[in-house]
UniProtKB/Swiss-Prot annotation:
Organism: Mus musculus (Mouse)
Positions contributing to NADH binding: G87, R88, G89, G90, A91, G92, F93, P94, T95, G96
Enzyme class: translocase
Identification of the protein by name: NADH dehydrogenase [ubiquinone] flavoprotein 1, mitochondrial
Pfam families referenced in this protein's UniProt entry, alphabetically: Complex1_51K, NADH_4Fe-4S, SLBB_2
Amino acid sequence: MLAARHFLGGLVPVRVSVRFSSGTTAPKKTSFGSLKDEDRIFTNLYGRHDWRLKGALRRGDWYKTKEILLKGPDWILGEMKTSGLRGRGGAGFPTGLKWSFMNKPSDGRPKYLVVNADEGEPGTCKDREIMRHDPHKLVEGCLVGGRAMGARAAYIYIRGEFYNEASNLQVAIREAYEAGLIGKNACGSDYDFDVFVVRGAGAYICGEETALIESIEGKQGKPRLKPPFPADVGVFGCPTTVANVETVAVSPTICRRGGTWFAGFGRERNSGTKLFNISGHVNHPCTVEEEMSVPLKELIEKHAGGVTGGWDNLLAVIPGGSSTPLIPKSVCETVLMDFDALVQAQTGLGTAAVIVMDRSTDIVKAIARLIEFYKHESCGQCTPCREGVDWMNKVMARFVKGDARPAEIDSLWEISKQIEGHTICALGDGAAWPVQGLIRHFRPELEDRMQRFAQQHRAWQAAS
C-alpha cells in the first residue's frame, strides 16, 4: 500500500505495511533521552581507554568489516537509508541519499570521499573528540563510506590548529595500513582504498565543502558556485562527496547493528544518536552522546549539572553552534533537540553545540562578538556578505553601548535579511541568524539600552 509522507518539504511515496490481523499499529515513541551505555557508539569519548588499534579492536571497531565490504555498495547504502541518518555537520541532509549520488557508472574518473574535519564553529568541539580519542572509528568509517560510493581514496581535511588530533589520526591510519585494514586489498576484500590527511591553515570558510575542496587543491579557500555539485565535479575535477566526521564515523556501527536499530532512536526523520557539546554557564561543561530528540532541559540538567545558579537563572541558549539563532528560557523549557523541533522553534540543530547563557550575560555584547567573528572570517567573495556583515558588525558595536535609535533595530533586521540567502555559501546566513534571534527575542533589551544611553547623554549635556 502506498502513502505520501512529507520529506524535506516535498512529498514522496513510501510503502506502508498494515497489520490487518490485530487492527492496531505499534504505538509511537513519545519520550526520548537517557541513552543506555550499550547503545552508545562512541565508547571512548573521554579518552579513558587506549585509542590505538589494540584498544579499538577491544571496543568492537573493525569487527566483521570485511563482511560489510563484501556485501557491496547497494547493501551499505540500503542500511544508511534505513537508518534515517541525517548529516551531522549542520545541514541535516539524508546521508544515504547523499552517498547514493556517487553510486553511478564510472566515466573513467576516480571518485573520492572528503571528510570535513575543519571544525571551526564557535562552541563546537565534537569532531575533535572523535579524532583524539576514537580515531579508528573515523578511519573505518572512511573505508565503509568509500565502499558505498565506489571511492578510490579518502581525504580527511583537518583544522590546522588541531595538532594533537591530527597526530593521533595519522598514527591510527598508519596502524590500519600495517594491519592490512586499508590500502591494497583492504581487510582482504579485494577493494583498494587509501586514506590521506590534509592540514588546513585555520580559515573558518574552509569548512564550506567547495572552499574545502579548493584548499585541498592548493588554491585559496573560497566557495565555488553550484552547480556543478561536488558529486559531479569535486576534488581534482572528480566526483566527490564531502561528509562530516561524525557522519562518517557512525556508518560502520550502523552497518553492524542494522539501520533499523539506529532508526529506533529519536523521532521520525530525526533518528539516531548524536554528540552534543554543552558549554557556557553550566556546572559541568561536557561532550555527551545522547538520543536525538532529547529535551534540551534534560540534556543540560542531566549531563552538564544544570545551569549555574539554577534553571531559573537561565537567560537564553544557542542550541546548535554560533550560527543558529538563540532561544529564550521560555522556549528552552519544552523544546526537543532535533532538526524539526528546533526549526519549529525558529532556530536549528546545526552542530548541536549548546551554548548556555545565564542572567549575568550581556546578551547584546555576546551576539556582537559572534558577528565580529563572522566579519573576520568572511572570504569577501560575495558583496552581501562582505559589506553586509561588516555593516552589521558596526551597528552591533553601537547597540552594545546603546548609541543608536530604536528605528535602527528594523534597519539591522533588514540588513540581515538582505544577506540571508543571497550569498554563494551559508556563512552569510550564519552571520545573519544570530542577529535575527537577538531582535526576535530581546528587542525590549535593545530599546531599554538605547533609552538609558539617551538619558545619560542628555544628563551629560545638561551638566556640561
